[in-house]
Regions:
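Sec-dependent N-terminal signal peptides
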Residues: 7-13
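N-terminal leader/targeting pre-sequences
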Residues: 5, 20-87, 94-195
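C-terminal motif of bacterial Sec signal peptides marking the signal peptidase cleavage site
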Residues: 15-18
Length: 195
C-alpha cells in the first residue's frame, strides 16, 4: 500500500513538472509571437497623407499629391493634369498657404539649411525643397515620383519636417542655377502639406 502511495505521488509530481514545462514553453512561444507582431506593426505603420492641388495664376493645373513615409524615407507621388506639354518645375515652399491667386503666399523655396538653390544633391548646395523638373505629356498630364530620407512627416527635426510647407508646380522648368529659385516662372498649382 505504501508503494502504491509513493508511486501515485511520484506520478503526480512527474505530471505536475511536465505541465509546468509545457506552460513555460507555451509562455515563451506567446512572448515570441507578441514580439513578432510588434515588429510587423512597426514595419506596416506607414504614414500616408494626400492633398488636392489647386490651380493658381489663372491656370487649369490640378491633381493630387501623396506623401508616404515608411522605413525612414518619404515618397512623394503627384498626379497632375491641365499642364502645358513639356518641362515644369516642382518644389516644396516655406508655407502651407495657397490663399493668394498667384500662389506667392506659399513663400520661397523651403531651405532650412540656408544653402544656395541648385539641383537635388548637388555638391554646390541645394534647397531641401528643390525637387526638380518633370515632363507633362501632350495631353498636359504628368506623374511625378520622388523619394528621400531627407524629409519626414511631423518629426521633431525642422531640417527634415515638411509638415506646414507647400507643394508648388511652376509654369516652366528649373534651370538649377538662377538664385534664389531657378527661374521656373509662374506658380500654376499649389497645395499645403498639413496633418
Amino acid at each position: 500500500m505504501k508503494k502504491i502511495k509513493l508511486m501515485s505521488l511520484a506520478l503526480v509530481l512527474i505530471a505536475g513538472y511536465g505541465c509546468k514545462e509545457v506552460k513555460k514553453e507555451s509562455q515563451e512561444t506567446v512572448d515570441e509571437v507578441e514580439d513578432a507582431v510588434e515588429e510587423i506593426k512597426e514595419e506596416v505603420s506607414a504614414e500616408i497623407i494626400k492633398f488636392s492641388m489647386e490651380p493658381k495664376s489663372d491656370s487649369n493645373v490640378k491633381g493630387d499629391v501623396t506623401f508616404n513615409e515608411e522605413n525612414g524615407e518619404v515618397k512623394m507621388t503627384a498626379m497632375l493634369s491641365g499642364l502645358t506639354p513639356g518641362e515644369h518645375a516642382i518644389h516644396i515652399h516655406q508655407n502651407a498657404d495657397c490663399s493668394a491667386a498667384d500662389g506667392k503666399s506659399a513663400g520661397g523655396h523651403w531651405n532650412p539649411t540656408n544653402e544656395p538653390h541648385g539641383k537635388w544633391l548637388a555638391s554646390e548646395g541645394y534647397h531641401k525643397g528643390d525637387i526638380g523638373n518633370f515632363t507633362a505629356d501632350e495631353e498636359g498630364n504628368a506623374r511625378v515620383e520622388f523619394a528621400t530620407d531627407q524629409w519626414c512627416l511631423g518629426c521633431d527635426d525642422e531640417n527634415k519636417n515638411i509638415i506646414g510647407k507647400a507643394v508648388i508646380v511652376h509654369q516652366g522648368q528649373d534651370d538649377f542655377t538662377s538664385q534664389p529659385s531657378g527661374d521656373a516662372g509662374a506658380r500654376v498649382s499649389c497645395t499645403g502639406i498639413i496633418e
